[in-house]
Amino acid sequence: MTSQHQEHTGTKRFSIQSDPVEIHRAIVEDGVAIIEGFLTPEQVQKLNKDVDAPLKADREQLKFKADKKDDPHFWLADFIPDHVARVHNLVDFSHCFRHEILNHELLHKICRLTFEESGDYWLGYGAVIENGPGTTEQKWHRDQPRYPLVKEGPDAPEGMLNFFTALTDFDAETGKTQYILGSNKRVELGEPDADHPIEYVGLKPGDTTIVSGKITHRGSDNRSDKMRRAMPIMIIPSILTPFDATCHLSRELVETMTPLAQKMICRRSVMIPAPGTVEVKTGIWCVNMREAGEQIGLKSNQRAKEDAEATDAV
């Protein structure tokens, strides 16, 4: 007897040297792909050091639980679950994120392929989420929000990519992320079934799962006595508004960054398809109808003040 069920081979795994075209194809087909060793051990160490104090402060502060029964508006900070700490705006305080992650070569190769139809892309947010012992299983969800002006469904252009990067072990005890295989091809959120089984994805520190906004997934319980820590790097088309604001960043800090990293934080103009075509690109987020950075005289690749002082002291 021949089975009528779809066959799923599981989430494809790649290395940092893998062909970005193959990785992109896996994301389109499966809604998820894993890159082992996306970050080096040194980068993982630096990022963990950068977020240790902010996460500790977040855990220690009294969390305000908003009563939203009669208010349709809310802030994410009011809805962080118990046992969870979360810190955003990594560009502000993490040298590694600002200079290494935002210039990650493979990340950009994959994003250029993914968002080719909608034009340039930039950072939606850079965050670290720490799930402590006692963290409970999430509800099934998709990361891509439903905007009335944006086409939805399996055939729609990609509205976001989440480079969900492990900073600690994701295993059977700390909790592997669960994905419903094939759910990126469904319109409805759906539940797992014989044609759409659950896959539990384990990660080592430095591995990343590239998650399409169309794939249904959830976090698992943390049954261990350890923290489970991940860095979601949310990339969105530049026609959408980022979650993390960058207007508060000083010009001095921004000018230490590369032009590419500056564009990722909305300090450079971006190119999108001109009306009625995808072949011709036109600039938006402009000053005087021209490139914003050039118009305001924005410099790049400048030495940070602390780096210059350290060099002068030697």
UniProtKB/Swiss-Prot annotation:
Record keywords, A-Z: Alkaloid metabolism, Dioxygenase, Iron, Metal-binding, Oxidoreductase
InterPro entries: Phytyl_CoA_dOase-like
Function: Dioxygenase; part of the gene cluster that mediates the biosynthesis of fungal ergot alkaloid. DmaW catalyzes the first step of ergot alkaloid biosynthesis by condensing dimethylallyl diphosphate (DMAP) and tryptophan to form 4-dimethylallyl-L-tryptophan. The second step is catalyzed by the methyltransferase easF that methylates 4-dimethylallyl-L-tryptophan in the presence of S-adenosyl-L-methionine, resulting in the formation of 4-dimethylallyl-L-abrine.
Amino-acid positions noted as binding Fe cation in the UniProt annotation, renumbered to this chain: 141, 143, 217
Gene3D superfamilies in the record: q2cbj1_9rhob like domain (2.60.120.620)
GO BP term, pick one: indole alkaloid biosynthetic process
Gene name for this UniProt entry: easH
Pathway stated in the Swiss-Prot or TrEMBL entry: Alkaloid biosynthesis; ergot alkaloid biosynthesis
Cofactor: Fe cation
Pfam families with a match to the protein in the record: PhyH
MF terms in GO: dioxygenase activity; metal ion binding
Signal peptide (from-to): none
Organism in which the protein naturally occurs: Claviceps purpurea (strain 20.1) (Ergot fungus)
EC number assigned by the record: 1.14.11.-
Family stated for the protein in its record: Belongs to the PhyH family.
Subunit description: Homodimer.
Protein name per the record: Dioxygenase easH
